[in-house]
């Protein structure tokens, strides 16, 4: 079991973009329409998450590159309250999810980068946090390549969670379609639309309602 004091350092998960062949050449990840692998037997989104920490696992994960399009996500953390830390992970080129936290407490994520490609990542969610608490996400860089033509409603989805802290979030794409918003709180149907911000705390409580103001046009005595 990977406990709080364990370490994974400098790991590149095989598969997907950037994979070299045995003879040294580049492995082409696309068919001629960018809709699948050239070998149809190598199905996108058909494997378990590349890195799965579960059932009380934890520890430090440093300098990880997980770009395998064949996996359901780059990293899944589930069912653990053991302390965990992620430093400088790049999770890229997945079909559905880049990083997922399910029923997790006491984890900190620093300098995470996610990236979606046009062919496989049009509907990919960079970060999902579900039924979790006491989570810190800091210096998070969320990116989509310029050729993406499929918009997506949000970059981070938080549901049934509390004490979630975001620090220094950068959500960027130089394509015409990107994310409509950055963070979506599903429990309260609240969307954070700002792409660059220094901090945001989600306590789990409903957001404060804005004060009601009389309309300038309909106020008594208006001309």
Label each region the model flagged.
Residues 1-223:
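Extracellular/periplasmic carbohydrate-active domains that bind, remodel
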